[in-house]
């Protein structure tokens, strides 16, 4: 959770990016939910406020891991790693997720297909977001505003709610497929967009996810039960 008005957010983002790139590349994916604060943030969406209230976010920047554990971004790296590792080790994925996008440039539209296969019979929900890189806005950085490039910005929720769309009960080793037709907003740059598919378990936590680029992106199943 961040904001253009937040003086400590650039430093927090630098720390989080370093931690992910050094220890969790391809495992942890970052989403930036912008909220209004002492001034309005041009990248704010309604769901940012809904989620910040849900997780009782009181300080910025803050991070929520798998819609479960919260942490500040000024924590010691060992503390941050412990929170990531707990989510990975204590709550392992029991489903695989694949996502693909077929982009129609003429209509500025993408057909997104999400596939979920479960290794056990369980109930799931699917949350799908549009995320954009390369947005340039003024940012408060340590008390001084400067030009700043914002990445991983959540632009739109494509599911019915932040709780996700019901996939129902998926039987062991069976696959469920859900498709979305996404009209791209005129203010978005298609080449900078990705779709994030978060598959939630029966407790409302992220069990697994997949990410693909908006322009004909494809991310096949990666999780394999050993």
Residue ranges of predicted features:
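Short, conserved sequence motifs used for protein processing/export or organelle targeting and
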Residues: 26-226
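Local sequence-structure signature of Cys/Sec-based thiol-disulfide redox active-site neighborhoods
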Residues: 1-35
């Amino acid at each position: 959770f961040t904001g253009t008005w937040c003086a400590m957010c650039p430093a927090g983002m630098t720390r989080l990016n370093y931690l992910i790139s050094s220890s969790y590349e391809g495992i942890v994916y970052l989403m930036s939910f912008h909220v209004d604060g002492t001034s309005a943030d041009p990248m704010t969406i309604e769901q940012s406020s809904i989620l910040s209230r849900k997780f009782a976010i009181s300080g910025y920047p803050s991070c929520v891991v798998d819609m479960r554990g919260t942490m500040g971004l000024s924590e010691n790296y060992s503390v941050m790693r412990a929170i990531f590792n707990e989510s990975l080790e204590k709550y392992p994925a029991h489903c695989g997720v694949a996502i693909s996008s077929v982009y129609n440039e003429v209509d500025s539209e993408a057909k997104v297909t999400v596939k979920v296969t479960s290794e056990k019979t369980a109930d799931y929900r699917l949350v799908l977001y549009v995320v954009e890189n390369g947005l340039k806005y003024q940012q408060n950085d340590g008390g001084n505003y400067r030009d700043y490039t914002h990445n991983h910005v959540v632009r739109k929720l494509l599911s019915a709610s932040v709780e996700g769309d019901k996939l129902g009960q998926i039987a062991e080793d069976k696959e469920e497929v859900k498709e979305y037709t996404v009209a791209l907003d005129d203010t978005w740059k298609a080449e900078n967009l990705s779709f994030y598919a978060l598959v939630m378990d029966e407790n409302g936590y992220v069990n697994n996810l997949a990410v693909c680029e908006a322009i004909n992106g494809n991310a096949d199943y990666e999780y394999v039960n050993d």
